[in-house]
């Protein structure tokens, strides 16, 4: 019999512990947990693939990395992650190490906005003189050019892909090995607490009287901060 607990990532340490405690309360005490992705808004394909023995810590770190990406980096990630995800969901396992490392170096990839097809890319190439042969053609003859074919050749040369109306030049992207599969890169520590209390001055008549002075505190707390 299987027991499971849903956990939305990234999660705080106490949330992860609560999820694990739920499994143990149901009798799942052998230390073996199978982890699968139910939904990933940024990369829906993750719900269809098989991950190569991911740990909960890896999944949480990966979720933190995705959450930290800006809009352009998200577009690039969706483009370059296609190298990692198999075309056949039933195929090879997907490495968590590669997924994590694929969230780095994204700011080095060129993006062209409002370019979502080969024809639009061809026009972009013409307008910006990106190809020497095209740039040498007189302006009065540009209308004769096959924009779609020019865009197709440029895309194939760049190894580029279209993502949500953007052209992402992924051919020059080299995935850095920031995560070695054992030790996570340095990151800012997150606050841990067993529980939180909202503390305020004692009211005289109504609780609303002191609502403005209320503050949240996390327990346990260091004596110096108390």
Regions found by a protein language model. Give the residues of each.
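Long, charge-dense low-complexity segments
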Residues: 1-226
